[in-house]
């Protein structure tokens, strides 16, 4: 058994100190999952369906804001091939990550919003600006997207009491 020593640091909002080593590990993991999201956006921009698929686990599930569901690389490849070759041809996809939560050391849940600009889809659809939740899983040291669940943005209307 080895003795390990850690610096303890206080993070605003937490009631107990956190090991500095754990914080550094979480920052590295966060950078890694954000890199996958950036690679996904870059592949979309390039119209590179194989690049999009490379960001996903082989058994990934994608649910689009239009309600399309694709399971596994082949269905996802077909879905993105039709979409990026059709109504979203020449479009850009920009993700803004709102929150990253590590459920375990190897599972991350990301909440964000995406904006699709350019192409017929963006011009004609209210779904061009939507929210999403991605689940990423690390296997063999590599982070990949296991689930994409995109959904329409909505606004809550507050009733006025008269």
Question: Where do the protein language model's features map onto the residues?
Answer:
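A beta-strand edge to alpha-helix "cap/lid" segment located at domain peripheries
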Residues: 2-54, 61-162
